[in-house]
């Protein structure tokens, strides 16, 4: 394999001159540049990104660690991250954890060995333990939630407000018998959305029915199991707040398999406003998280941290909005 020394010897220049030509880091005459680049082509020389990073202290590469790429919410956020990385001439390496702590640690090590300039973390799975040893010395941005404290910038969404808005939309449609299917309540986002639900009921002077609070998971199966639990009760709610759109999709399937109609028999409110939500039958009312904005803001914040590593850490909060479609039946 050809090296810079080989190129320098054949071009009869110093290795530093070869480096300046390849990296464009200093003026070199056109004659020398053409000579060096001709030899580079003849030897089929490809400079190592890692080797170059040792000189310039950057690889123009960001790592993204995410729970799963097949979750629609994560997928849409990742699209925003990738788009903004490309706009800033950064490469993106994506690794998944699948909810496995060992895989989390292995992928973190892999990303650090690839000399990424910084990391985006979007994999705060509740199955991870807070005592997992993570020696991360890179610039970090935590997106949405993480299972332990880190020295990092954080981008969160106001999930308590989102839970309140979701429940209030059902109350405004005349519903007073409102259930909720949460994600795993070890996650702060699930806790906060539940608190928002409770706040809206309290404000409307609606008694809380603990049997209508079903803890589940932020996935399709979580919605199926959650609705099955609510439908087996002797007293059923007329509306259900699903704490993610993936839960709502599972709920749709379970409701329709029971021969029930949405929204006539059971109104459904989702959370996240994934692209699929508008294409469900009926289209899903939901709480919109600005996913593209989240992706863009995460990259902007990480690049700022890479550039200014000694700045104080920041916590940025995104505000959700309510999107009303056709999955809520008016009882008024």
Swiss-Prot record:
Pfam families, A to Z: LacI, Peripla_BP_3
The protein depicted here goes by the name Ribose operon repressor
User: Signal sequence: where?
Assistant: none
InterPro entries, A to Z: HTH_LacI (IPR000843), LacI/GalR-like_sensor (IPR046335), Lambda_DNA-bd_dom_sf (IPR010982), Peripla_BP_I (IPR028082)
The residues that make up the annotated DNA-binding region are: 4-23
Q: Which UniProt keywords apply?
A: DNA-binding, Repressor, Transcription, Transcription regulation
Gene name for this UniProt entry? rbsR
Q: Name one GO biological process term.
A: regulation of DNA-templated transcription
């Amino acid at each position: 394999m050809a090296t810079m020394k080989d190129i320098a010897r054949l071009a009869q220049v110093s290795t530093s001159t070869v480096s300046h030509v390849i990296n464009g880091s200093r003026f070199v005459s056109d004659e020398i540049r053409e000579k060096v680049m001709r030899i580079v082509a003849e030897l089929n020389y490809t400079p190592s990104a890692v080797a170059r990073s040792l000189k310039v202290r950057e690889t123009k590469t960001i790592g993204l660690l995410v729970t799963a790429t097949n979750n629609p919410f994560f997928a849409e956020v990742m699209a925003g991250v990738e788009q903004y990385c490309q706009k800033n001439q950064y490469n993106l390496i994506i690794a998944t954890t699948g909810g496995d702590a060992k895989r989390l640690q292995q992928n973190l090590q892999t990303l650090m060995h690839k000399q990424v300039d910084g990391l985006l973390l979007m994999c705060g799975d509740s199955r991870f333990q807070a005592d997992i040893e993570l020696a991360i010395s890179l610039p970090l941005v935590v997106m949405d939630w993480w299972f332990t404290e880190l020295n990092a910038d954080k981008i969160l969404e106001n999930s308590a407000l989102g839970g309140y808005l979701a429940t209030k939309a059902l109350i405004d449609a005349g519903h007073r018998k409102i259930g909720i299917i949460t994600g795993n309540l070890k996650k702060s986002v699930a806790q906060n959305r539940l608190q928002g639900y409770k706040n809206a009921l309290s404000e409307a002077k609606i008694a809380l029915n603990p049997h209508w609070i079903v803890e589940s998971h932020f996935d399709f199966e979580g919605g199926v199991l959650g609705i099955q639990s609510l439908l087996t009760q002797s007293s059923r709610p007329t509306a259900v707040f699903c704490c993610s759109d993936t839960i709502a999709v599972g709920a749709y399937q379970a409701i329709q398999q029971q021969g029930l109609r949405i929204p006539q028999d059971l109104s459904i409110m989702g959370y996240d406003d994934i692209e699929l939500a508008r294409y469900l039958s009926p289209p899903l009312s939901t709480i919109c998280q600005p996913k593209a904005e989240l992706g863009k803001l995460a990259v902007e914040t990480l690049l700022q941290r890479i550039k200014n590593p000694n700045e104080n850490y920041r916590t940025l909060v995104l505000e959700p909005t309510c999107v009303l479609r056709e999955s809520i039946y008016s009882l008024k």
